[in-house]
Amino acid sequence: MEIKEISVPQQGVVADYMNGKKEIQSCFDYMLTEDAFKQRLHDLREREFFRQDLVAHLLEYNTKLQAGESTLQNVKALGDENTYVVIAGQQAGLLTGPLYTIHKVISILQLAKEKEESLGVKVVPVFWIAGEDHDMDEINHTFVAKNKKMKKTIFYDRNPKKASASESELSVEDCRNWIEEIFKTYPETNFTKDVLKFVDDALKKSNTYVDFFAHLITKIFANSGLILVDSHHPELRKLEIPFFKRIISKYKEVQEGLRNQQEVIKELGYKPIIETKSHAVHIFMEIDNERVLLEDQQGKFVGKDGAHSFSYEELIEEMERNPARFSNNVVTRPLMQEYVFPTLAFIGGPGELAYWSELQQVFHTVGFQMPPVVPRLTITYVERDIATDLFDLQLRESDPFLNDVDKLRENWLSNQIEEPIDDHFEKAKKEIADIHTSLQRFVKKIEPGLGAFAGKNELKINEQIELLERMLKRNVEKKYEVQLNKFRRIQFALRPLGAPQERVWNVCYYLNQFGLDFVDRVMENSFSWDGKHHVIKL
């Protein structure tokens, strides 16, 4: 593997944050300097965490996942007051979801290792599975290349319900059939059978979406020391109840902190992305087997548009009696993460970084400092045949990342033709239009009743001109079919659907192409944290 870095233009909060713009950096409590990480350690040492209870739960959970010894040792290390975590999170996507989930894990593993060495303290990697999430449309699909198109392949659950991913049962046989259909779109390789067995072994141990995700991630990163946590696990929820109570007692201040921070963001010229109802309590409650967001209504906590109503005392009692009924929303999830883990750094994608910039005053409301927020590593893989296509078309490796591939294709095609087709036909259409306008005036002058017919005549002529243009372009494209297919392959591989590769392709494609140790070999590379995009030639 050969790794290269390229500067890809970014926009909004992420671009300004990475470029060191002070105005947006003031929306975060720590800069990304070594001194700031030392200050973070100092601040964490002044807080108390329920380490032993957390260790007991994480040991049980990761042992059930058959995690490696290095993971279990890292869990035990969390019992020491001088151990800290680098953390990231994601929904439990089928087959682990898009590649960026894998890249988040790689990011926390690398940063944890680096900070352990530079700060001289134990730093362990933790991945927070958003098991409470109930938006199945976000996790029930993957993309494949089929019939010369990128297609979204959805797993249709037989019994869909608005339950969390941790509680949504997975039909193993149906999912197995869905996975087999996906693998049929991949080339048959020496690794295909092993990868299918690898995936099926994880599937057979799974009852829910989160189970399947957790087993796969555990197997892919078997020797890395990665700790997994299911944010909706009932045993973890018991440990979180004191903080749920704090949120309930301060929900108005939380909402006010969010609104005030969003005003700051607006004044800086950015558009807030967190949308909440004005009376939101920012906590979900399970009602009739569905996650329902609680709202404040005249001093009562209500759900389902007032169909269910609780007093403060009733809600607190229910939390103590049945903690598994409660979960966080987008605003309180980062707060709960901060409550549970001694977080040295949080790693997030561009969208997460933007929405965390809206949470600073929310953190302060509950007495926390926002942890250092580190943008995750971004990676694209370039297979050998794609590198050859780029070379054959005389494109630079950076071209597909800095330009629209369709535009590159159009420019290349126009360069193969002495005179631009579009320009020639536009000129012809204009000249014909001028002639026909004069002709229509003459016809109307002689016989006004033929005016409408003359207009239709012009339309028919234009239709024929456009037909000729399409036929000419089709013939030219057929002439350069080999080269244009290279552009199509480049688009599918590097910018599928016009998006970054890591937002569309799934890791199973690369495991199938390069073997089960593919991710291990990727992690042997050294990555920088300067915001540049990492291009890995395979």
Curated annotation (Swiss-Prot):
InterPro entries, sorted: Bacillithiol_biosynth_BshC, CC_BshC, Rossmann-like_BshC
Coiled coil: 248-268
Keywords: Coiled coil, Ligase
Catalytic activity, EC: 6.-.-.-
Pfam families to which the protein is assigned, alphabetical: CC_BshC, Rossmann-like_BshC
GO MF annotation, one: ligase activity
EC primary class: ligase
Family in the record: Belongs to the BshC family.
Protein task: Involved in bacillithiol (BSH) biosynthesis. May catalyze the last step of the pathway, the addition of cysteine to glucosamine malate (GlcN-Mal) to generate BSH.
Protein name: Putative cysteine ligase BshC
